[in-house]
Amino acid sequence: MKLTIASLIVAIAAFAAYAQAPTLQIVTSDPNLPSDLFYGNVKVKPLRVRPGTNPPQFITIDDSDFFTQQQYVDFLSRMPDASGFGFWLNQITSCGGNAACVAVSRVNTSGAFFLSIEFQQTGYLVERMYKASYGDSNQTSTLGGSHPIAVPVIRFSEFVPDVKQIGQNVIVNQGNWQQQLEANKVSFSQAFVQRSRFTTAYPTSTAPAAFVDQLFTKVGVTPSATDRNTAIGEFSGAADISDVAARGRALRDVAENATVAQQETNRAFVLMQYFGYMRRDPNGGQDTDYTGYDFWLTKLNQFNGNFINAEMVKAFIESSEYRSRF
């Protein structure tokens, strides 16, 4: 709250200097998700009051129900469904007043969202599609001395709208979710391969075999003959990749390859700590490079992907940067 109050004082002083009245704005980028509150051009935190309480009881990120809801918003880009919400909330509230149990359950609950079928088939798939299409981004880390580091190429500003598109109307284990998810994947992949960035990287005159080989090279995987032939076969013997639907299917064949998914897991898991909890890129905000990302990826690898033993999720949800969002 101190940072917010300080920001408001600065903003008020600035507006006063120019004799302009500040305005309070509610900004909604997605009508299905919580809105942002701005005082002038300064983003501020709203006071959340629990309905029916008198005197008012304020809701914070320490409240189990609000914390659980936020995992849906940050990782699945949707509000929680009743059954799922009840299940995850119970994982925390079943601890009663045992603070140590609550702390562990919050970590386990939050980490489970990355590992969930819904996220693996939406957000994580989007990350792998960017990887298959554009490879890595070369950045810098100072961990153990300054050195280059290859990191996921997708940026937060790209990730957010793409996840909303591919996950639209999907709630695992509800209704015809599998058919809806597949329809979303088809629609998203076809739109993705028609973007100018993609068609510039892969002209439609490219031969299917060359196209598929480039995609597998980007992900750093040598495919089996079967996997390679399956992806090439999407073009049904055509001489080029002008068929949009076939391009989309071939890209998915590579991005959904089991080896690719396994190899990219830890890198994506660390990336999602920044995208999900901090709502920014790893080299944004208080970070000017990928040193923090490098630190957590190194630690997660040391613990063979065990985020609990690596204390990665714990560190992010207990960080002042995360908590100050609320």
Where are these regions (language model features)?
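Sec-dependent, cleavable N-terminal signal peptides
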Residues: 1-21
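Composition-driven recognition of low-complexity segments enriched
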Residues: 18-326
